[in-house]
Amino acid sequence: MPISTKSTRRQCLQIGLALLAAPAIGAQAAVAVEVWKDPLCGCCEDWVVLLRQAGFSVKVNDQGNDAARKRLGIPEALGSCHTASVQGYALEGHVPATDIRRLLREKPQAVGLAVPGMPVGSPGMDGAVYQGRKDPYKVLLVAKDGSSTVFHAYP
């Protein structure tokens, strides 16, 4: 049975289009995160690097984070050295990328997540200078009324 030229061209075109579309299947656009930090803070910069390595697109503002923390609704008592915003949620401190992704997946009614202080061993506070030390810390889910609950505890 002879193969028609029209049929062969059509099949080649369909295969070519499928191959062009293949990289887009399953590909996700990078989630945008905006960060406010002090320009001289090394641990904040380390956290930004870790977010980028985890696939986030990060914009950095080096004017400090006090105003951003207040504007985004994070209580001062839960403060840390940097504040960020992602898809309508606030992030305070050294929040792990896995917890950010969980927050975005679960979409709780909340202000966002906070890791108060600067716990050693948290992302960005885990460099060689700390010699492998890991202190326990908690990622808190911050409610709109300012209260918080444990979102994830790290031993």
PLM regions with names:
Residues 31-46:
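Local sequence-structure signature of Cys/Sec-based thiol-disulfide redox active-site neighborhoods
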Residues 40, 47, 64, 96-100:
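Stable alpha-helical elements in mature extracytoplasmic
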Residues 32-33, 57, 87-90:
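Short active-site oxyanion
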Residues 58-68, 78, 86:
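Thiol-based oxidoreductase modules, predominantly thioredoxin-like and allied folds used
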Residues 77-155:
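Thiol/selenol-based redox catalytic cores and closely related redox-interacting motifs
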Residues 1-7, 11, 15-25:
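N-terminal secretory signal peptides
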Residues 5-7, 70-77:
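Short low-complexity, flexible loop/linker segments enriched in glycine and/or proline
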